[in-house]
Amino acid sequence: MNKFIFLFIFLFISCKTFYTGSFDQPNLNTEQPEELSSIVSKWEDGKRTTGKSNEFEWWYFDTKLDNGAILVCYFYKVHFLQDRYFIGLNYNDEDEDIFLLKYFNKNEVQFSTDSCDVIMGNNYIRGNLDEYEIKLDPKDFEGFGVELFLKSSLKPYRPKDGIIKAGDDFFAWLAAVPNGSTKGKIIIDGTKKNVNGDGYHDHNWGNTPLQKLFDSWSWFRGKVGDYTIIAAELNLSDKRGGYNVPILYIGGQDTILTNRFGDNGIYTQYTNLINNLYPKKNEPLFSSIKLLTEDGI
């Protein structure tokens, strides 16, 4: 019995270490990379990983259509225990609530390093920071498909170089299209509907599983009048120092009201603790989060 208990404890510790990493991990770097030009180049939205173990990358798109429907899709590549390539989609309107994943073999996918040009089977997302095409083949998604065009109305955004580093481990983010207009077709069971709306596209990549860097994060995008807001807070794990990293961007077509990141005059305020909803062992969660800047924006 004692041998069994010892073996169980050993396996538990081993699995925990395997999942979240070693107990000795570098803290968040005090200075984050700032080597790129403030002007984003289209190669930055191309493939940024090489396929090394633990790397991952995805290209994300969402749109809120004028009829109230919401579409989210993401083209994903991961290199953990094995190489995996897939597309995920969510579509919701008053009649449909669709969530689907489609996996592809390595010989069915292509990626460009010059710009966003991601092909998985007969599906793709491609563009040049200004205009994008997104196609999902109904044959791959149980009769659901899209043929959409996204036209950016704002310049691309990233905080500094868009890279959050802890030692050599990192997670990176580029908001290639902070806001834009969407038009095209939605296909449901052979019926095509012309649609219009507004859309967003970003690109994420890194070289270590996210649970080894973060406990959680919050992310928001929206519009107030002519201004687009992108806000986030990254909550690093205790092994990485336990820091909370806020991000706030507010911009219009010709003006950026604020662009703040990390300790650059931006603060987070939580109110309205949520009680009696989540397990007590969970971290505290709040229904109201405010991002405050030192200049009052």
How should each PLM-predicted stretch be described?
Residues 4-13:
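Sec-dependent N-terminal signal peptides
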Residues 17-297:
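Structured soluble/peripheral alpha/beta segments that form catalytic or ligand/cofactor-binding pockets
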